Amino acid sequence: MRLRNIPRANDVIAASPLVIQDPKAQRGLWQNVFGNDHPIHIEVGMGKGRFITDLAKKHPEINYIGIERYTSVLLRAVEKLQGKEQPEDGAEQQENTRQDIPENLYFICMDATELPEVFAPGEVDRIYLNFSDPWPKDRHAKRRLPSRQFLARYDQILDKNGTIEFKTDNRGLFDFALEEIEPAGWRLLMHTFDLHADMELMKDNIMTEYEEKFASKGNPICKLIIDRERR
């Protein structure tokens, strides 16, 4: 998918206090960034940021970091949270105050391949992967976020009891993820091929923009949770 280039994206992101500008310099020091020792949960491929923003508002006892590689996508999350999103109907903009923005939330603009350079071993307690790019061509399999190549990267930064939660409406990508778990040395804790049909699982479910869109069309949403096999 070709993303539209937005000229102001780089400048807005560079000036935003929500975006960590030199994340590699914070490796092993993220507790200092947040000013506390709360658990750290990250979302890789956060898109427009609704999921992780809602989580941060709901759970002030947890620190959240949203990761997005595309500036044009991250721009939407930043401007929405700061109350500066460009209105589509000519309505007057209202800028949010700092009190409206969760203090336990930051964003990073980076490629997920760099995760071990940004987080020290054991520094992250949970990773969320939501509606990731399926990279449908076989030669691109290693680019898929639930691939064994990426599982090896997550292994380097997760706490020993850390978990990964993955949601998608793409059954092919979900089946691929299920096949990668055991060979990569991970353990499947739960999975469902129709999340929204399970009322118990839906109690604490926070939907992404894509999830809401796909579910409204009747597309089944798949979800799994994994951790590493005890070593």
Predicted regions and their residues:
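Class I S-adenosyl-L-methionine
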Residues: 177-179, 184-231
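S-adenosyl-L-methionine
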Residues: 1-42, 50-57, 79-121
